[in-house]
Amino acid sequence: MEDLTPTNTSLDTTTTNNDTTSDREAAPTTLNLTPTASESENSLSPVTAEDLIAKSIKEGCPKRTSNDFMFLQSMGEGAYSQVFRCREVATDAMFAVKVLQKSYLNRHQKMDAIIREKNILTYLSQECGGHPFVTQLYTHFHDQARIYFVIGLVENGDLGESLCHFGSFDMLTSKFFASEILTGLQFLHDNKIVHRDMKPDNVLIQKDGHILITDFGSAQAFGGLQLSQEGFTDANQASSRSSDSGSPPPTRFYSDEEVPEENTARRTTFVGTALYVSPEMLADGDVGPQTDIWGLGCILFQCLAGQPPFRAVNQYHLLKRIQELDFSFPEGFPEEASEIIAKILVRDPSTRITSQELMAHKFFENVDWVNIANIKPPVLHAYIPATFGEPEYYSNIGPVEPGLDDRALFRLMNLGNDASASQPSTFRPSNVEHRGDPFVSEIAPRANSEAEKNRAARAQKLEEQRVKNPFHIFTNNSLILKQGYLEKKRGLFARRRMFLLTEGPHLLYIDVPNLVLKGEVPWTPCMQVELKNSGTFFIHTPNRVYYLFDLEKKADEWCKAINDVRKRYSVTIEKTFNSAMRDGTFGSIYGKKKSRKEMMREQKALRRKQEKEEKKALKAEQVSKKLSMQMDKKSP
């Protein structure tokens, strides 16, 4: 069997001094961005977005309108923006275009924030020369209704999606991501920009495996940096640095009078994502580069452990834990990583380790900071760390990228190049005529009497299940084929769940103490079950890898049962898939897994609908009673 355990080749060619005393800072790092031989050989290839962005950095943002781009596909949307995959008409280069509605921005007082984001992106790209690990702006423009930001296209998803898919990473991969994020943050901080919303979702993974820090909607200047205040007017659709403009670039300067040298931070109000927000932001205090370092520490913790350091049942308790620094390292957490994270997750930002000290820390001693943009990134594998007395395991199934796009469909299912791209998630086919399973004899009968016997036998088993099995309420009246407790692992954490393999097919997992259906493993044509040992097995799906452990050491029975059911329902699964591809409902069936917030919002909407219907029914009942009483009075 092929050993796919990653080798230590990605980060170590140069060793830095591991002296990390607080009074010594690492020397400034200059990246070596010289093209490799393979890059030079491709100089005659068609123009790319990277070429055009590099040209715009030198010559200024080109003047464009929405008619200069073909809007091909929506890639996602936020509270007040939507991102599209677009092709520039003149060059055929592919870009991502972020579109914002002016009416929404004005109605919710967000216009100033978007102007600031535009000016920060322009400043980082046009004046600072851009950075390989930071989103670079190609151009921006606006019309009467919308604002457009044109940036480089990244189709490999983000770090948050990869963490959702794989659960956690090994030390080598975690260190790789942390080192590249730190390099990108160093560029921002050297140019007096603080991101203020560092989280896995804002770290994109490029096609070559390197990262890209994105989403500067919460970013701010600090240290006296004065950015252009230019808003969205007809005049600024053309770059101030373009060849047809004689005006100089926006001036930046540092005001020592306004911001003293010893106080380079600025006051702020709470923005960002609660899981990764720093204590100083919660206290409405001074925010500077150390706020981003806090976010980096939370990301590194999650890469290794599988969960963020601060978790709670609700936001109130979550923020309280952050303020009180209430977190702990789970069993099995690497000691070398816990030491550096303990220096990052410090309440007082003035005593928090700095980016320069981080680069010089022994944790990063094998990182070649100068050539980091040219190293080969590690391949992402399904991996479970050593914990609970079990060794670490790497998947022996060939490494694949998270997500289900055209390439993944072609690779997994040989569907061809016309497959629609979408994000994967749970597959819930409606119950169809049962095709048989390994536990119920329902092979197509030769006589009506046999069919009646099979139906009667199934009905009897279903009735016994309804009466005796407390988990029947979760099955939608489907027969349970196999059930049992499994430890569902995610990094260094595990939760005991009751798993139900039922007709349909469905593979459900239940939180037994609270009697709550927590989720369902998706059934897709490319589903794979991998047995690791007598107790551990993996289930590979487009959305994520499930790491499961059977305390009874009967993992092989689970693998066989799941594979048997998958084979028997293969026609149903493939039929549903093909129908979704043909009808354009692929996204709704295999769509991106809903967040807890989205599910809660849907539940509230459902409750409101039910309450409205109940009130309507009550009102109708009252009207009916009133009419009945009136009729009774009129009757002799």
Curated annotation (Swiss-Prot):
Pfam families: PH_3 (PF14593), Pkinase (PF00069). PANTHER family: 3-PHOSPHOINOSITIDE-DEPENDENT PROTEIN KINASE 1 (PTHR24356:SF406), SERINE/THREONINE-PROTEIN KINASE (PTHR24356). One of its GO terms (molecular function) is protein serine/threonine kinase activity. Involved in the daf-2/insulin receptor-like transduction pathway, which controls longevity and prevents developmental arrest at the dauer stage. Phosphorylates and activates sgk-1, akt-1 and akt-2. The PIF-pocket is a small lobe in the catalytic domain required by the enzyme for the binding to the hydrophobic motif of its substrates. It is an allosteric regulatory site that can accommodate small compounds acting as allosteric inhibitors. Its EC number is 2.7.11.1. GO terms for cellular component: axon; cytoplasm; neuronal cell body; nucleus. The active site is at D197 (proton acceptor). Residues 69-364 form the Protein kinase domain. This is 3-phosphoinositide-dependent protein kinase 1. Its main location: cytoplasm. Interacts directly with sgk-1, akt-1 and akt-2. ATP binds at A79, Y80, S81, K98, G152, L153, V154, D158, D201, D215. It is found in: Cytoplasm. Keywords: ATP-binding, Coiled coil, Cytoplasm, Developmental protein, Kinase, Nucleotide-binding, Serine/threonine-protein kinase, Transferase. Changing Y148C: In sa709; increased resistance to oxidative stress induced by paraquat. daf-16 mainly localizes to the nucleus as opposed to the cytoplasm as it does in wild-type. It comes from Caenorhabditis elegans.
